[in-house]
Amino acid sequence: MAEDSGKKKRRKNFEAMFKGILQSGLDNFVINHMLKNNVAGQTSIQTLVPNTDQKSTSVKKDNHKKKTVKMLEYLGKDVLHGVFNYLAKHDVLTLKEEEKKKYYDTKIEDKALILVDSLRKNRVAHQMFTQTLLNMDQKITSVKPLLQIEAGPPESAESTNILKLCPREEFLRLCKKNHDEIYPIKKREDRRRLALIICNTKFDHLPARNGAHYDIVGMKRLLQGLGYTVVDEKNLTARDMESVLRAFAARPEHKSSDSTFLVLMSHGILEGICGTAHKKKKPDVLLYDTIFQIFNNRNCLSLKDKPKVIIVQACRGEKHGELWVRDSPASLALISSQSSENLEADSVCKIHEEKDFIAFCSSTPHNVSWRDRTRGSIFITELITCFQKYSCCCHLMEIFRKVQKSFEVPQAKAQMPTIERATLTRDFYLFPGN
């Protein structure tokens, strides 16, 4: 009797865990995962597939769900254990220390309950969970991610912690209408988008960048939601940062990608990003010029004609970038003129050495950038918010301008994000969800 109740309890756990997944048709993901990993034989797989000879559709669906749940229970230790660990390891689920200990020590059946409880508490985690399942197999194109719950208005007008997706119809309309004006987007099943995050938080001679881990988590989740596989590195010297950038530029996945993001967060000076060994008497700096050289068309042909977006969160000097003025008409603008020249050039084939770049820096030259110890950098926080709200309908330059506009009125701590070395020749839409 006790044994039967134990089985019922386990069954209940798995049913609760996969209720939403079964209703959404994501059982196809599990079937495909089993086929790839040869978890069960063809006979076992067939028990998950409805019998097409059955006459009653409702009976067929009920039988299918019962068989699926039963099979999932049978395969739990082989498949789901790996899924749970993957989610915890990649910070899809944010568990408190006591929850983590309980999670790793408990049985597979109870891990399902912990997972469900965590998802219920956090709507974003629920969406990330679904997106992670889909990202684990990018070739499943018949299943629409549950992230597309944004068809209606959000829970509140000010809700900004959810990535809004671009409806498929709008994506197709914009691609058709502005075909020659936008960067082409590769099909989801054919592309491998990569993004790199380098964040230095601990230094040998400089203060620690407290709160920077919020920036890492936020940017990583944003980029993953936009379809990028994220490589993240922490606490590197300038030489190590350069080595990581060169290795990243050489990745073969860029050939099948349509764009890339580089996110660099550290202390900084006007000319570049500080490495962990930096001090005034002995600088340890990765120059911005070096970054552009590594990814230009001479050294990184795999990203030729593809947007290369560089996000920089770092001080660029020690000034505060603010001043007090009276309300008065603006001063006369300085007018510069340049005499025309007769230019001639002969070449069989020519390409620009530096093209399709755009850098977005957290402050203007010579000025500081601000970071909140409890929330992360002000610039990165606002950047993530604007991407979440506007990447569904705006191209990259429009999103960057919206970030700048949010800093238009100086607050207690003033800074003005700056777009630099922009050589994009088309509009770059991210079309999240497509």
UniProtKB/Swiss-Prot annotation:
* One GO BP annotation of this record: positive regulation of inflammatory response
Give any Gene Ontology cellular component. Answer: cytosol
Q: What is the effect of changing C315A?
A: Abolishes protease activity
Q: Which residues form the propeptide?
A: 1-136, 328-346
Q: Does the keyword Kinase apply?
A: no
Q: What does induction of this protein depend on?
A: Up-regulated by bacterial lipopolysaccharides (LPS).
Cross-referenced InterPro entries, in alphabetical order?
Answer: CARD, Caspase-like_dom_sf, Caspase_cys_AS, Caspase_his_AS, DEATH-like_dom_sf, Pept_C14, Pept_C14_caspase, Pept_C14_p10
Which EC class, in a word? hydrolase
Per UniProt, residues of the CARD domain are: 56-148
Positions of the catalytic residues: H267, C315
Reactions accelerated catalytically: Strict requirement for Asp at the P1 position. It has a preferred cleavage sequence of Tyr-Val-Ala-Asp-|- but also cleaves at Asp-Glu-Val-Asp-|-
User: What does the PTM comment of the record read?
Assistant: The two subunits are derived from the precursor sequence by an autocatalytic mechanism.
Tissue expression notes: Expressed in barely detectable amounts in most tissues except brain, highest levels being found in lung, liver and skeletal muscle.
The record, for Pfam families, names: CARD (PF00619), Peptidase_C14 (PF00656)
Picking any one GO molecular function of the record gives: cysteine-type endopeptidase activity
What keywords tag this UniProt record?
A: Apoptosis, Hydrolase, Protease, Thiol protease, Zymogen
Q: Which SUPFAM superfamilies match?
A: Caspase-like, DEATH domain
UniProt EC number: 3.4.22.58
- Role summary: Thiol protease that acts as a mediator of programmed cell death. Initiates pyroptosis, a programmed lytic cell death pathway through cleavage of Gasdermin-D (GSDMD): cleavage releases the N-terminal gasdermin moiety (Gasdermin-D, N-terminal) that binds to membranes and forms pores, triggering pyroptosis. Also mediates cleavage and maturation of IL18. Cleavage of GSDMD and IL18 is not strictly dependent on the consensus cleavage site but depends on an exosite interface on CASP4.
Subunit details: Heterotetramer that consists of two anti-parallel arranged heterodimers, each one formed by a 20 kDa (p20) and a 10 kDa (p10) subunits. Interacts with MEFV. Interacts with SERPINB1; this interaction regulates CASP5 activity.
Hey, which family's this protein in? Belongs to the peptidase C14A family.
What name has this protein been given in UniProt?
Caspase-5
Biological source species = Homo sapiens (Human)
